[in-house]
Amino acid sequence: MKSMIEGVKKDGKKGRRNDRKDSWDKDGFTQRGRAEKKPVDLAKIQGIQGQIGIGKNKGDGNRLDCGMDKEEAEDGKDIMRCRHLSPGGGGMKRLLSEDVRETEGIGWESLGLGPVLLKRIRDIGYDFPSPVQVASIPHVLGGKNLLVRSKNGTGKTASYIVPMLNMINSSELSIQGIILVPIRELALQISRNVKRMSEGTGVISAPVVGGTSMQDDIIRVSNGVHVMVGTPGRIVDLVEKRVGTLSKRVILVFDEADKLLDVTFGETVTKLLDLLPREKQMLLYSATFPYFVTGFIRRYMKNPLCINLMKELAPVGVKQFYTYVKPSEKLLCLKSLLLRLSINQCVIFCNSIKTVELLAMKITEMGLPSYFIHSKMAQEDRNIVFHNFLKGKCKILVATDLITRGVDAPNTNYVINFDISKSPESYLHRIGRAGRFGAPGVAISLVTTEEKEMLMDIEAKLGKEISPLSDKGLSRLHESNIDRNQG
């Protein structure tokens, strides 16, 4: 990373700028930065469930029998079909890949949902449920504990929000549902989805996250809510203080379960489980489930049903490329990509906060306004940046892995790894930002010769070779104009 800045100099002097008085260290980085229900039609969904691997956890103590093995990914040719989908009710045309279209003939009416919620789904404009929704919703309604493995951007969120809303008794003003997520932005996003989906149902929800006023959260929850959406720490604080009334039976969702159960949050999560009523339904959702999750499942989940939809790890609609580049030429290579690609919106990932801040400045200097976001920013600033990016006020967002988990920016058609991911799991979640709900996208990684082994590790995990990006290939990408708003 040392000479990353060498490609862009001001007045012929490395690290000097005309418009600011920031000092630069020897590596060219700034020394400071800113920071009535219908019966479930099981016959209709039997076929899809037979394909995707639904079964109980064997619990042999050595591995989790929930699709840890994977098949070799297909090359992705001819997978795209034009489909009229209007998730916002706006009639937007999108290209959808087969991994979200294979349930197209199954209606929401077959899943056992009540009339109020079915009407709301129609009003929003969801044409048909995705495979993960078809596979899991009837089992959630049946009170099962679930472990669901599904690719990023395939509708996992609705697969638990919809049945949860259907099961909640709105006349009982108690906390009946808790949705745990690892990052604040995802909590706010899911909370908006719950509020939108629950319109007309009488269900009250509230986001509760760290970095915001605890007093405000206490007031909101004390006034009565049915669903809390938030990060583990803040939810534990509220439950410990006995804020709000807990129902005798709680539906507890782990979104991005692998992250919630790692060393970062594991202790807090287990504390929450001890505080909650013994009677609870637990739903775990993620694209990746490391082996350490097995111990948690054996201890806390009674007879969980495993649903695995991972025929391949990567989103089918995302084309993946890499290009070898010298560290000193990374910035120039990135500039060439940004100028030549037909970008709706793009997320550029870096491995450090310092690189994120500096790179955003450099991209803006190129005449391409960009935002940056990372965990050390004030929550208010993070909210503004993310909101503005979602609203399309800026095309380019430079970020750490903060936003790799479930965050949905539907107009993002390109992901660029300025720094290659430190782990295959991180890579998988990164590229998922460009393939939301089966839409097409492209992921490009800039790889130095020292990082070849990391690239090989990622390919081994995916079970697929990532294609090198040639100049001709780049031209083809430009000509193909991968646009999420066009069929």
Curated annotation (Swiss-Prot):
Catalyzed chemical reaction(s): ATP + H2O = ADP + phosphate + H(+)
SUPFAM superfamilies in alphabetical order: P-loop containing nucleoside triphosphate hydrolases
Placement of sequence motif Q motif: 106-134
Helicase C-terminal domain: residues covered: 317-478
Gene Ontology CC: one annotated term: P-body
Annotated Helicase ATP-binding domain residues: 137-307
Main location: cytoplasm
Positions bound to ATP: S150, K151, N152, G153, T154, G155, K156, T157
Compartments it resides in: Cytoplasm, P-body
UniProt similarity note: Belongs to the DEAD box helicase family. DDX6/DHH1 subfamily.
Record's protein name: ATP-dependent RNA helicase DHH1
Underlying gene: DHH1
